[in-house]
């Protein structure tokens, strides 16, 4: 069964209920951002895709993906 993408951040704001939905927490998300040198305020959209990988766009419209 394929999973649907789940939005985790929008315009620098964490969507806490969606983190709970995917069995993650804010500490996990902050660690992911720190490891990749990202700041919450620079994230336009960040989501967990159907393959359980993080995909995001920054305010500069840079698309990146990582596990």
Task: State the predicted function of each range.
Residues 1-67:
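Terminal domain-initiation and capping elements
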